[in-house]
C-alpha cells in the first residue's frame, strides 16, 4: 500500500506530455502532426484512463485503511525560509481525482467526433489535456503555494477554451469577461494566502490549521480576530469567483461561447468545481470562524435562488444549463456554510455526472441542429427553433431526460440523495434558508422540464408555418417567455421573419447561415433525413436532425449509468448488517481531522418522511412546467374563444404583469450585468478620461508652460542687451544688489 502512494505524483504529470508534444509538433512538424491527429486524441484518452485507474486504486485503499498520506520535498532558500513541494492524498483528493478523470475521459471521447470538423482539433485536445493536468495538480497540492500555481493554470486553460473560437468577437469578449471577473477572485485569494502566512508562518495545510486554530482559541496572544477573519474572507472571495457564486457569477453564461464539450468539463469537474474544492480543502480553517461560515451559507442561498430565477427565461439551451450549474453549486456552498461537509461533497459528485450528461446531450442536439440552421449559436442553440426532436434523436432524448430527472431530485437518481440531504440539514440550520432552498428545488424542476419540453416535445419549429414569437394566447406567451403582442398575429406568419417561402426550389431560405465554413478533409460524410412535400406547384424539402455518431453516444450512455447508480455511495442510512454509506467511510479521515463525530445515519421512516416533501415540490414544478409548455396546451392558441374569455378575466392583467416582470428579470440577468456596466465599466472609463484630461491639460500644461515662458523671457532679454560685456556686468551687479537690499529689508523686520 505504501508503495502505491509513493507513485501518486504521476497523477497530475501523466496527461502533461500531450500538450507539450502537440505544441512542439505543430511548431516543427505541422503536417505530420495534423495527419496523426486521431493518434493524439487516443493517447490523451489512454493517459487519462491510466490516471483514473490509479485514482480508483488509491480510493479503494483509503476506504479500507482510512488514512492520509503526504509526501513533501523541501527546497531550502536560506536558514529562515524554505519552500516545500509535494502531494497530499486524502479523501478529498481521491474523490476529486476520480471525478476529474471519469468526466474528462468521457468529454475527450465525445470531442473526437464533435470537434472533427474544426481546424483547431489538435489545439483543442492540447488545451483539454493541459486543463485536466492542471486540475489534477490542484487537487493533489499539499500547500497554498501549489494551490495558487495550479489555480492560475486552471484559470488560464479555461480562458483559452472559452475563447477557443477567438475570431468570433463574442467569444473573445466572453474570454475577457471571464478573465477580468476571475482576476478579482484571484487577487483576493493571493491576499488571503499572504495574510495567512504572515499570521502563521506556514503554507502547509496541517501546520496552517493547527496554528490557526490555536490563534483563534487563544485570544491573549495579541492576534487581531478581525484581521484573521479578513484573511479568511479573501480566501473565500477566490472561491466565489471560480465557482460563479453571487456576485461574481456574471462570467458563467458568457463562457458558453466555447465548444460544448469544454462547457461540460468546466461545469462538471474543473473550473467551477475548483472553488468548491478550495472551500472544502480549507474547511477546518473556515469552520472556526462563525462569521465566515454564516457568510458562506448566505452567499450559497442567494446564488441558489438567483441562478434558478435567471434560468427561467433563457432561450439558449447552454445558458439555461449554465444558470442551473450556478444554482446547484449554490446548494453545495450552502451545505459547506452549514457545516455539512459530507452532504456538500456528495452533491458535488452527483451534480457533476448529471450536469456532464446534460451538457453533452445538449451538444448532441446542437451538433444535429447545425446541419439544419447553420453554425450560428443564436440558431443552433436556440430552444425556440427546436421541439419535436424525440423521434429524430431518441437516444439523446432518453439520456437527457435521465439527467433532467436527476437534477430535479426524482428518486432513485443521483441528485435526489444529495439534494435531499442538504434540504434536511437546512431545516436544522435555518428555517428561512430551508424554505428558500425547498422553493428553489421546485423552480429547478420547473426550468429543467421547460428545457426538456421546448427541446424534445411538440413539433420541429424550424419548419412550423403557424408560429410566431408573439401570440395572443396566454399559454403560448408563457411557453416562449416572450412578451405578448398588442395585436393578434395572423396565422400565416412564419416562425421568424427570416423564414420565408421560396417557390424556387434551388434557392435556399434566408434563415440558413450565409457564412461558409470551410471543413477539413477529415470531416465524416453525414447524410440527413429529409421529407419532400408536394403542394400544387410548390415543392418543399424539409431537413430534420439526425442522431449523433456512436463516439458521441457512448459517453452519454456511460454518464447515464453514473447518474443512475452513483447516488448509491452515499445512501444515508444504516440498517441491520447493511452498510450502504460508502461515502462516510471514505470521508472518515477528513471528518476526524475536523474533530467531529457526525452521525449521518437515519432510519427508513425518517428518511421517507423527509423525502416525500422534497419530491412533492419537485413533482409540482414538473407539473407546472408540463402545464405551461406541453404542446397540448400550446395548441390552444388557435382557439379564439378561450383567448377572448381569458382576456376578460380581471386576474389576467395582474397575471400578465407578474409574467412580464419575471421575464424581464430573468432575460436581463437580474440587471446585475447592467449594473456592473454602469457602475464599474463606465465609471472606470470616466475616470480614465478624467485622468487623460488632467495629464494632457494640467501636467503637460505645466511642463509646456515652463518651456514657453523660458522661451519668451529669453526672447525679451535678447533685445535688451547691446552686445557689451560691461553692460551685462553692470546689469548683473545691479540686480544682485537690489535682491540683497530686499532680503536685508525683510530680515530686519
Curated annotation (Swiss-Prot):
Report the gene name.
Answer: ndhF
How does the protein's chain sit in the membrane according to the entry?
Multi-pass membrane protein
Q: Identify this protein by name.
A: NAD(P)H-quinone oxidoreductase subunit 5, chloroplastic
A Gene Ontology term for the protein's cellular component? chloroplast thylakoid membrane
Stretches that traverse the bilayer: 9-29, 40-60, 89-109, 125-145, 147-167, 185-205, 221-241, 260-280, 285-305, 329-349, 356-376, 398-418, 427-447, 553-573, 607-627, 727-747
Molecular function terms in GO for this entry?
NADH dehydrogenase (ubiquinone) activity; quinone binding
Q: Kindly state the subunit structure of this protein.
A: NDH is composed of at least 16 different subunits, 5 of which are encoded in the nucleus.
Acetylation as a keyword? no
Keywords assigned by UniProt? Chloroplast, Membrane, NAD, NADP, Plastid, Plastoquinone, Quinone, Thylakoid, Translocase, Transmembrane, Transmembrane helix, Transport
Among Pfam families, the record links this protein to:
Proton_antipo_C, Proton_antipo_M, Proton_antipo_N
The biological process GO terms on file are: ATP synthesis coupled electron transport; electron transport coupled proton transport
Q: What is its EC number?
A: 7.1.1.-
Recorded catalytic activity of this chain's protein: a plastoquinone + NADH + (n+1) H(+)(in) = a plastoquinol + NAD(+) + n H(+)(out); a plastoquinone + NADPH + (n+1) H(+)(in) = a plastoquinol + NADP(+) + n H(+)(out)
Localization, per the record, is: Plastid, Chloroplast thylakoid membrane
In the record, the note on similarity to other proteins reads: Belongs to the complex I subunit 5 family.
| Highest taxon above the source species | Eukaryota
The protein's enzyme class: translocase
Q: What does this protein do?
A: NDH shuttles electrons from NAD(P)H:plastoquinone, via FMN and iron-sulfur (Fe-S) centers, to quinones in the photosynthetic chain and possibly in a chloroplast respiratory chain. The immediate electron acceptor for the enzyme in this species is believed to be plastoquinone. Couples the redox reaction to proton translocation, and thus conserves the redox energy in a proton gradient.
